[in-house]
Amino acid sequence: MTTNMDVDTFVAALAAKQPTPGGGAAAAVGAAVGAAAAAMAAAYTMRKKDRESGAAAAAEALIATLDTAAVLAAADADAAAYAELQRSWKDADMSTEEKAAIEATALAVPVALVERCHTYILAVQAFLPSCNPNITSDAKVGIHQLAGAARAAYQTALVNAPPEDVRERLRAMLREIQDIEEQLLELA
């Protein structure tokens, strides 16, 4: 599965004409890279003066929040959900209930990834004032990478025809993410 591939193998598999890994996996791996970049910035905010100022406690809290394994697992969950979707398209005898459950899972994976990216971005943004000033760019890279992953996961969610309330909730998160990015880029 995706989580066991090295970067070169994953990129080659993503570029190949095959159903998985696909866009959902790309979003998940991008989110993991973003979370890792932000976690690294937090790891460098553990100096003696950071401990004395309380910045190290903020860094430790951020590291505890950023679960790269969880976002990487979304890559495999996306592949499994897509395989089930393909099966549902081919199985004429499948019950309506089973098809609905498969479709719900296929939607839930990217929705959860957008939500997680949003949560992580808010956590990194809250950490920025405490971040070691020599490495804030890496924390910001984390935000931007997570933002891209959230937008990519949103596109995957849209393919799965979310209800309007889910779509609007995701759009609200993306708008908030966009506002954060614009502030970081000094575009706002």
Report residues per predicted region.
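Conserved phosphate/anionic-ligand binding catalytic regions in large, soluble enzymes, centered on
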Residues: 16-39, 134-153
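Amphipathic alpha-helical interface segments
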Residues: 78-154
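Residue-level recognition of alpha-helical structural elements
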Residues: 22, 26, 52-55, 67, ...
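A structural-propensity feature for long, helix-poor, extended segments
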Residues: 50-90
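Short, hydrophobic/aliphatic alpha-helical segments
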Residues: 2-21
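Preference for long, well-ordered alpha-helical segments
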Residues: 120, 134-188
